Amino acid sequence: MAAELVEAMNMVKSFRVSDLQTLLASMGRSKSGLKQDLVGRALRLVQTEYSPELLKNVRQLYETRFPKASAWLAARRPETVAVNYPALNSSPRGTGQGTDYLNGIPKPAPPPAAEVKLVPLPFYHNLETLLPPTELVAQNSEKLQESQCVFDLTPNQVDQIRNSSELRPGMKSVQVVLRICYTDSIGVQEDQYPPNIAVKVNQSYCHVPGYYPSNKPGVEPRRPCRPVNITPWLHLSTVTNRVTITWGNFGKRYSVAVYLVRVFTSGELFNQLKHCSVENPDRCRERIQDKLRFDPESEIATTGLRVSLICPLVKMRLGVPCRVLTCAHLQCFDAVFFLQMNEKKPTWTCPVCDKPAPFELLTIDGLLSEILKETPEDVEEIEYLTDGSWRPIRDDKEKERERENSRTPDYPVVDICVPEANGHSPAHSGTNQTGKSGSGGASAGTGSTSGGSGGGTVVDLTLDDSSEEEGGGGAEDSEETDDSQDSPAPKRGRYDYDKDLVTAY
């Protein structure tokens, strides 16, 4: 047991990044990170979860890369190992069969037929397997190869296709799809097209998804590798259907499979998510309290966590807050927009932290759903507190808007009063409105002085010295006094012409 464990660890240390990612993905582990992180993660996996299945996967990966060395290791294995792992095609020592050796040197073992498993897709539910994963075998050394596969439809399968509803005109919800993936590695495989691919169904070429244009300079366009719908070109009867695949042979091995599937829409997936994966608000509060719990060993105490109510995908207010169970953040994204975007361009990546976000791990935040119903539309951010409660966060613009709309002003009020009949302004406004009170008193200044009433003298500051000297005659003063009692005297400037006749440009 110890010798096998050491052997498996040595094999893991010689793996490439792609081999490490395949091994970790086959065992349900994260395959992101640098090579040293992947190696450490794979070694811990071998040490902590050692099993015959894991050892088989490690050996198959190693034999794929080092076929000669794996044959030599297979010849050195004891009989017990060969009995426990017959699928490796390794011959035990001491059998005495001459076919296992050639001139005293053990023959290299043929490459194992790896069991290919395709990753399940949320929008495609497998009903039946029409053609299991089959390797595309090159017939010659030409770069452009052609492979053919055949399959038949049963009457029940034909009825399922014909009686299914339409997603849109001409597209049924029950389809026959073709999927292609790598064969070089083991474990669960994602869809991957070979270069120069072309698919012909019953002598008619079918559509294969093209490349996504890239907005970044110097970045090659990316091709979406999704199942190919071949239903419109099939014989919906018991007649045999033939599929011809043209592909480029550039050293990598591929496998092809055909499935009968039911296609879901983003709305149907959202209904599944809404009925099966909603996190209880009390559980959300417990998680918030755990994050904000005081740590005596930490020098920094967190008193609150701010969460935006704006979806990072579409920059709009959240409708259905959703997040991934494996993510550490509390920030959510809108579930409806997330499913719609993955329906058009499947990436299944968290828009907050860019980590994998498979549909099986999505959940609706029940607490944030209640908060969205209680808060007005203008609130764009909230803060979770240590006791699990929350409070809205308003920015400076909203505070200023509320201050303007409030009835109680924050600044002193200045009263502008009308002068009294005797030409004097009120005492409380004389200091604030000096110019206005003085000019207002000037309109009745002559009348107040001639009448001999009590009070201070009001001086018209708009008149200059020359105007006072011109009007100095006694008879003229009495006439002007009589006129001023009937109507206010017009202000006189230092110009002889009438100001009303001057045109302003």
From Swiss-Prot:
SMART domains: SAP (SM00513). Pathway: Protein modification; protein sumoylation. This is E3 SUMO-protein ligase PIAS4-A. It is an enzyme of class 2 (transferase). Zn(2+) binds at residues 327, 329, 350, 353. Functions as an E3-type small ubiquitin-like modifier (SUMO) ligase. May play a role as a transcriptional coregulator in various cellular pathways. Catalyzes conjugation of SUMO2 to KAT5 in response to DNA damage, facilitating repair of DNA double-strand breaks (DSBs) via homologous recombination (HR). Mediates sumoylation of PARP1 in response to PARP1 trapping to chromatin. Negatively regulates induction of interferon phi 1 (ifnphi1) mediated by mavs and ticam1/trif. Residues 395-505 are annotated as: Disordered. There is a cross-link at residue 35 (Glycyl lysine isopeptide (Lys-Gly) (interchain with G-Cter in SUMO)). Residues 374-505 are annotated as: Required for nuclear localization. Keywords: DNA-binding, Isopeptide bond, Metal-binding, Nucleus, Transcription, Transcription regulation, Transferase, Ubl conjugation, Ubl conjugation pathway, Zinc, Zinc-finger. Induction: Up-regulated in response to polyinosinic-polycytidylic acid (poly(I:C)), and interferon phi 1 (ifnphi1). It comes from Danio rerio (Zebrafish). The gene is pias4a.
